[in-house]
Amino acid sequence: MNELKHAVVPIDLQSFCLEGTLALWVPALENDSEDDSEAIETADDNEKLFKKECVAYDAGVYTSNKSKGSQTLRWSIFQNRTLTIFDVSLNSKKEPLSKFNVKIHFPSNVMKDGVAFSFSEHSDTTIIYAITHARVLYYIRLSKTWFQLPDARLDDDWCLCYRPISFLNQKPDLMAAISTSEICVSFFNGGLTKIILNPKDASHYEQHIDDSSYLFSLKKYLSLQAFKADYRSPNTIISMIFLSTYNVLVMLSLDYKLKVLDLSTNQCVETIELSQTILPLQSFPYLTSDHTTNSFIALYYPDNSHGSFSIYKLNANAHSFKLNVVIEKGIIPPSLPDDEFIPWMLSDFQLISSEGSQSKFLLIIAWKSNLNTVIQKCNLSLDQDESFSCVWSHSLDSFSLIEKTFFDVPTNMSSGDISEIWLQHIFAHNTSIESIQVALLSFQNSSSQVSKNKLDKFGALTISELKNAVLSSIVSTIQIEPNSDLTGYDYYEYKRLLYNEWERFAKLVAYLDHFGDEILSINFDPSNAVTYINYANKVAFIRDPYLIESFDEEPLTKLISSLETDDPSLIEGYQILDLGRSLHSCMSFSTLSEIRYSLRELVQDLPSYSLFDTLWVFYDKHIYPNVDPDYISTLIDTLVSLENPMRDIDSLIQRLRSFDIYNHSAQSPSLFLCASVARVLDSILKKFQVSIEGFIFLLSLITSQQDYELQSKFAGCDKLFLSLLEDWRLVSFLLENSALLLEKFEEEDVDSTNCNLNTMEALASVNTALQFFSALNYSECFSESQISPLHATVISSLSAIFIRDDTENDLVTELVEKLFLFKQYNACMQLIGWLNSDPIAVYLKALIYLKSKEAVKAVRCFKTTSLVLYSHTSQFAVLREFQEIAEKYHHQNLLSCYYLHLSKKLFEESAYIDALEFSLLADASKETDDEDLSIAITHETLKTACAAGKFDAAHVALMVLSTTPLKKSCLLDFVNQLTKQGKINQLLNYSMPTLRQDVDNLLERKAFQMINVESQPCWYNILFSWRYKHQNYRDAAAIIYEKLSRYISTTELIGKKERTFIIEHYLIVLNTLELLPKEDTWILVTDMSVDKEPDPNFLPQKLLTLDAIVAEYHLQLKDVAVQVTAEMSSAMNIDL
């Protein structure tokens, strides 16, 4: 079970290779919406936000066995009322099929154990049943296309909601899906009902199943127990499973009875009386069946501190069913850690038949406490005499828990060393990044001294950014006052306070990350032979880990364990290595931290005196105080008994340095595996480091002993020590920097002068991310020109993770392209330094810079690419738009098409000036005449020029397009952009003789569409100015009169301000008409007194002469005079 740790994957990484999320909201039934006031009040509580958004309270895996193949869905329910579903099915290349995950939002919380699945072979859809706390049953059709298409079509009846009558009086408790239209629901206070749904007309009916084997008596009914608030009826079902092979429901009730219900007749056909336990039964999945044959049922029974289990075989004959006990066995207490006094509870258990066999089974049991999780398994074999043999094993799975033993502060350690050790201590474990972020937010909110680099929200940060934020926040909280004698600060007090703050933060991280350690369920996928361990925010895999090829055969473990069988001559060397590893295991974390700092000092500055003295001092300082003297004596006796230990150690080390960990196979690694390379590298390098340190510890022990026989057998160990020290230098350096595999590398780092000539030559030949990483750090590790054997092994072996086949390729480019298509722009930016100078790589750099709002770098990369890109259009999806443009214009003028494509890309990212530059380059680089291409380029120039505010260029492009069908849409963009940027005078000054009437019609349409004639920009005024400029005085006066008429008709109360507006506009109309000859002083305006016809395009009009308008003007003047007189009279009365 050690492979369990290596198969743990955080839930957020499951969406790493997805393009997006399909969010769905189910319709709410009456009173099915819960109050969100609590959520609003606690929105700023980081801890509750973390638990609500990142920690599930129910999870599982459902596999639908189809004739065309299986579909595996992993689902989780979070406290924000969201059901998240991942389609984790794989294709023949072990790559994920889905592109999207599905999030279904409910108006109220979904019940624990309130989700069930069924599959319809006819419609190829998965049915989801969900029951909420509001007692509403939801019937959801989950289509396979939802995981593959961004615009998946939803049928009107994709979700149906019901509230069965039995739900009104009783609280639902457990549910089992029988078919695509039938479910069985048990109730909290007893009872069972079968609900049959008819999705066609959204109807349903119930069949209540009576339990004739239990009769209530008046005495029991009137007992004192029945009046308790937490009373549950004895026939309450606390666990049930459905066996599809036999169409039966197996149930366990509170009255200690195991029952079999035949669903075809709704009759109980078998009942087994169980002995009462010392612990009360509660709602818990006590029952499980093998998912392959459906014939064997396992029952957990809490009859002692750890309980026991029984396995029953279901024998069916027509409608007769019989449960026969195959085995009854007590559970052996698992090996618990030091917290054995903390209560342990059973979390879940699962029975698995081995490849459909009816003689071999695997029983997996999950235990949990407040601090740890233990996975226990039992291998069961049914012998010919029908007796079972069991073999127990367990695995302590505390992968996300920071060690509880914290080190003491050494007196010779600086404050910087303390902070560095704590950073490594926190980030070295498989702690989720979200928990560290939330811990940092909580830490900053509780510390008033933190002011710099303060996080404002819960979001995505790179590891280096998060480390810097943690370091600056914790250091800034320490405030030390000067000593009383004013000689300086108390440095030792500063180190003590710094250590306390780091310890407080580490415990907070462990506390938050522990929320996700609870095991929610265990599921077996028989089609893929995978067992899923579902944690609250993680998922683990037993046997064949999902998406991680050969992870259960961890490379170095496989190497170490196979040395004896592969090469018998290495047996002695392996035994010596085992001694060194045992000596290494005696050291605590704080001791190892000090030892590694000492080794680092030795690497940086080798002593000028004897190496034997160095090893002796190393032993006295680090080994002797921390290891039992009796154990040291035992080690010495073992070493003396060896015949030729130096030869054995040298042979083993050479094997370690040259062993090919991964075979170069033709299997295609999944994208997820490439993303997990940092974890793989970290695991392998840690084991290398432990092995090397074990040998160094042994050498220091040997040189410190005054034993002639021992010294003679290890002659020449000083040279071996120097060799091991160099290996340790490389491994430690790569281990400390392995997190950089997904960190940001600046593009300029490739040309850094810090890299020597050998490094630059190595960079020229690399074609994988890991090789790039190793070559870039080459100058830090070695000063000699020849690469060491271990360094070559690290590069050749670990880089095989990235290699698709034996031929050279650039998988880094393909990886970055996939990340870009999946909209993982932050990850792309972190990998940008790994891209080489190929045209497609430079093009990808430009796209990444563009998405990161670094347009200057993007344009520089765009200009350095060439038309060689066109030969890659069929290989890379990011070039699909360029390919479509080139095909549209018959593969002519490729350079112009490419510049046009770049202009569109830059325009999409609001880089308008650069987009205009490339559109002009596209026009200038045309080699042959193509009218359609010219129109497309001119149109793009118009759009980009308008958006960039370069209206002179836009005006030129508009006049070119004045004779094309695009003129109306282009004119609309031109006018809108000018008015939006306040360039109205510039619009009026442009000469557009061929578009004069089009501009007039456009402005008139916009004027008539105005709701408030006083809003800005006022299209009435713009149209008046346009007509006035072109000496169209009659229509200019008419449009102002239209504005005036609409103003009067929509104004209810006319005061001083309104009178002024009316008088001013009448004067504008009259002054404009005065410019016309007397016989032409008339206008046509809309007649407001006539009701409009049904035809919206027809507007009744009337003719107004100058005299009529003057008469209206005089009436307005009289109204003004009356209003002024009334105001003066009122004022005089007040004075009197």
Swiss-Prot record:
An example molecular function term from Gene Ontology annotations: structural constituent of nuclear pore
Biological-process GO terms, alphabetical: poly(A)+ mRNA export from nucleus
One cellular component (GO) term of this entry: nuclear pore outer ring
Location(s), subcellular: Nucleus
Keyword Transport: yes
Principal localisation: nucleus
UniProt entry keywords in alphabetical sequence: Nucleus, Transport
Superkingdom of the source species: Eukaryota
InterPro entries: HEAT_Nup120, Nucleoporin_Nup160, Nup120_helical
Pfam family, one: HEAT_Nup120
Role description: Functions as a component of the nuclear pore complex (NPC). NPC components, collectively referred to as nucleoporins (NUPs), can play the role of both NPC structural components and of docking or interaction partners for transiently associated nuclear transport factors. Active directional transport is assured by both, a Phe-Gly (FG) repeat affinity gradient for these transport factors across the NPC and a transport cofactor concentration gradient across the nuclear envelope.
Subunit structure: Component of the npc107-120 complex which consists of nup85, nup107, nup120, nup131, nup132 and seh1. Interacts with nup107.
Protein name listed in UniProt: Nucleoporin nup120
Organism placement in taxonomy: Eukaryota, Fungi, Dikarya, Ascomycota, Taphrinomycotina
